[in-house]
Amino acid sequence: MFTATEAVPVAKVVAGNKRYPGVVALDNVNFTLNKGEVRALLGKNGAGKSTLIRMLTGSERPDSGDIWIGETRLEGDEATLTRRAAELGVRAVYQELSLVEGLTVAENLCLGQWPRRNGMIDYLQMAQDAQRCLQALGVDVSPEQLVSTLSPAQKQLVEIARVMKGEPRVVILDEPTSSLASAEVELVISAVKKMSALGVAVIYVSHRMEEIRRIASCATVMRDGQVAGDVMLENTSTHHIVSLMLGRDHVDIAPVAPQEIVDQAVLEVRALRHKPKLEDISFTLRRGEVLGIAGLLGAGRSELLKAIVGLEEYEQGEIVINGEKITRPDYGDMLKRGIGYTPENRKEAGIIPWLGVDENTVLTNRQKISANGVLQWSTIRRLTEEVMQRMTVKAASSETPIGTLSGGNQQKVVIGRWVYAASQILLLDEPTRGVDIEAKQQIYRIVRELAAEGKSVVFISSEVEELPLVCDRILLLQHGTFSQEFHAPVNVDELMSAILSVH
């Protein structure tokens, strides 16, 4: 068990600078990480966090400045720098997990280093090695279990266990809980505390302040490529941290106040069953209403939206749009009926990263921007620029590849796509996942503006604390049905308690 008696640096960046064409990614950054320390790395998207991480892992070379791992300077050519950083004990777990779904937990943990005996893979030794690694972090899964059968939380823990197998000095966790529900976050927090107790230094990247305070003792806050401040979390307010991130005073958003909603149903779901997660789902969405759906990961929230929009088939039930019954929804038909849908994973299903902002904006409604089958690019750019202005999208131009934008700007384009298409009903699945605080607040504002214009929104989020900030009404999905209903203003503590309760 590691006990810190004095600060022992295990990683340092000294006067680190990095520039890309037209962008200063890091500007004279000094950063120190000590043995056994859990240090949060905070900042808006584009603040320089990712560049700093890439430097520490050796995937980026600084234009000037030094990187030290322990007492060794990290140096070498681009082809060998990443391997050298790994040899010195730097590991990273990114948002997009790299596990091989078709292999077992043990095979993933030992990938590339499978033990051999008499020229053959020693599966018994592999299982024993994997079990020791899992037990060290308190991960309760079988080494023989296929990764494809694990829950998202279990996969995240196996990914963390894999980097721990090499006895690292430094582990970087980039948004490790962004796809996890509140109850499952506890498993990751427990694993990180065990890593720290073993003397491993952890850099923890997250936008969830409550979680950060539970797991980290200190934080480095970045803004515009610089270190805006190094703080001890126990005596630093969240208001001050957010002010460091934004470079100005932060105004907290109050929960939505009760609104007078027109009693006009635009979407009704009646007794919908979609095995294995949804048993008996009924609800009504009214004109100008923002309806939140809360629940644990795996409760079936995403499956519900996919069933409504026609991406997944359901066994029984009715969907009614503006009074018209739809027996078997078809995605293309639902779009024509004025429903817009933003998927849970925008990178896989929401954007085409190599296309420009303009082409991504008009993906779903080519009729508006074509004449005699020919795309009218002047019209496309004009409409896209209008959407970019409305949605406060920051990009060099409407032709900028969307994959180069920050997560928040990508998400605003995805939502803006349906504003452009004049959709009257928006189904938003995790619209603020992986975006920074300022972008979240902009998305809240946009959603409320759309509701004020008479559009109706279903809003799913695993960040329970944000639902009261944007929703007029919240339904709690538990055990395949809606168990409770909350009306604005919603107390987040009551909502959280209801979500975590066991009935």
UniProtKB/Swiss-Prot annotation:
Residues 8-249, 261-499 form the ABC transporter domain. SMART domains: AAA. SUPFAM superfamilies: P-loop containing nucleoside triphosphate hydrolases. It holds the Pfam family ABC_tran. Gene3D superfamilies: P-loop containing nucleotide triphosphate hydrolases. Signal peptide: none annotated. InterPro entries: AAA+_ATPase (IPR003593), ABC_carbohydrate_import_ATPase (IPR050107), ABC_transporter-like_ATP-bd (IPR003439), ABC_transporter-like_CS (IPR017871), P-loop_NTPase (IPR027417). The keyword ATP-binding applies. One of its GO terms (cellular component) is membrane. GO terms for biological process: transmembrane transport. ATP binds at residues 43-50. GO terms for molecular function: ATP binding; ATP hydrolysis activity. Keywords: ATP-binding, Nucleotide-binding, Repeat, Transport. Probably part of a binding-protein-dependent transport system YphDEF. Probably responsible for energy coupling to the transport system. Belongs to the ABC transporter superfamily. This is Uncharacterized ABC transporter ATP-binding protein YphE. It comes from Escherichia coli (strain K12).
